[in-house]
Amino acid sequence: MANITAMALTPSKQLDASFALPDFALPDVVSGKTTIPADFAGSKALAVVFLCRHCPYVVHVMPTLLALAHEYLDAGAAFVGISANDAANYPDDSPQRLKDMVVSRRIPFPVLYDESQDTARAFHAACTPEFYVFDPERRLAYHGRFDASTPGNNVPCTGHDLRAALDAVLTGQPAPEPQHPSMGCNIKWK
């Protein structure tokens, strides 16, 4: 396991209840195809996950996130991952290395690369992993953590908080409160 003490633990920022899905046009690291929000039209919920390869907090949640994504994709939700880390200084987060991760882990949703970091700024993203759930009108319903588990705290990784938010949005209910901030490695800004 990576040395967690060497990582800068960063919380996500609180967003206003009126926050709506920002527009973006980013390349899929596997296909190279430009992905835009309209590609997820028709989904009952959209989960956006800021992630990377090297952060131990992302590595910690990834197996459970993949299982949860498979379950909720079948229920009508859509997922998209976005990596915005500066690949020049963090080559493990380059598009090619992200592609290797997507293929080897069989990630069931597109992972996009935000080279300019403009999309991360539009989302007010601060850390990896960081989770957003948008309703069918693409209004923010949830912004926060995956669950209470972190590397080394011995709390089982279940995806409880993200799961509760997705369940609420898929049934037309408001997401549960309180929404706890995500905690992870800071986005590696240029």
Where are the regions a protein language model picked out?
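Chalcogenol-based redox active-site neighborhoods
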Residues: 2-179, 186-190
